[in-house]
Amino acid sequence: REWQAAIDEMTKLLSKKATERLIDKQLSESPDKMYAFFIFDIDEFKMVNDRYGHSFGDFCICSFSDILKSHFREGDILGRIGGDEFAAFIQVSDTECVEEKVKILSSALHTVIGRGDIRCSVTASIGIALYPRDGATFEDLYQQADRALYETKQRGKDGFTIVS
């Protein structure tokens, strides 16, 4: 039962609670390493749901999560932390590699998702916080990355912001 609560049923990604637990565990076990925490939000997802229905919206979320899964390594932490919001936590060597990674992700998430006769252009806004610079816990990093995500949305979506 605890395992079921740790996994998001639709996407098979970690739940928010499991994501938080694993990140805090990793930070306590390896506090001397550098990490990047990403929040991904599907742009205009409410409009997709309203226009094409919840079944297609669920299909979009699953397709989006599949794209994310294909761009992370085993050992990276990847979770669904809200309706159309996802998080990733990876070990990094420097901020330049974070920028390279997020550019690749942003490009991959700018896609067309289709099923049957429906085709929908999808983009994502991304906020990124770095450990240890931007916080010492999941909650710290989440708040900072969420602020960066908000900045991305304010600038017009379909992009990314790294906390500065």
Segments predicted by a language model, with ranges:
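Core hydrophobic beta-sheet residues of small sensory/regulatory alpha/beta domains
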Residues: F37-I39, I162
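A structural signal for short, well-ordered beta-strand segments
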Residues: F37, F86, A124-I128
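Residue-level recognition of strand-loop junctions within catalytic nucleotide-signaling folds
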Residues: D50, F89-S93, H110, Y131-P132
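Acidic carboxylate motifs that coordinate Ca2+ or other divalent cations, activating on Asp/Glu
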Residues: T11
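Cyclic nucleotide signaling catalytic output domains
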Residues: L78, I104, I118-R119, S125-R155, ...
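Conserved long alpha-helical elements within nucleotide-processing catalytic cores of c-di-GMP signaling
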Residues: E2-A6, L14-A36, D43-R73, G79-G83, ...
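Short catalytic/binding micro-motifs of nucleotide second-messenger systems
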Residues: S70-G75, S107-R119, E151
